[in-house]
UniProtKB/Swiss-Prot annotation:
Compartments in which it is found: Cytoplasm
Keyword Iron: no
NCBIfam families recorded: rbfA (TIGR00082)
Gene3D superfamilies documented for this protein: 3.30.300.20
Domain of life: Bacteria
Sorted UniProt keywords: Cytoplasm, Ribosome biogenesis
GO cellular component, one term: cytosol
Family: Belongs to the RbfA family.
Species assigned in the record: Thermomicrobium roseum (strain ATCC 27502 / DSM 5159 / P-2)
InterPro entries found in the cross-reference section: KH_dom-like_a/b, RbfA, RbfA_dom_sf
Record protein name field: Ribosome-binding factor A
Amino acid sequence: MPSYRQARLAEFLRDEIAAIIQRELRDPRLGFVSVTRVEMSPDLRHAKVFVSIYGSHEEQEAALEALQGAAGFIRRLIAPHLHTRHIPELHFKLDRSLEHAEQVARLLRQIQQERQRDESAVESTPESE
């Protein structure tokens, strides 16, 4: 379980990185990127930045590549606002939790439709006496 300091720093980084991506980075590959969460290492030297990217697999890979290329620039913009000994290294990861949630919802809808079909089939069959 992350410490209070890790959680606070992760939340701060999530907000700052999202703002920097939106306002400072002019890369067209970053059009539909959202920072979903940040996980800090116990020593606060590394930050896994999870992002959700709307688009095809190729567009997602291109956006991740652009983010990793801009990691040094983002660190420099964040540095004056951090009161830590070290500025964390940023590691961008694709957050697939939204895709997973969508897949679960789709499966649940499919099960519900199958149940409704089964119930209507049972109701429409004549009862034997």
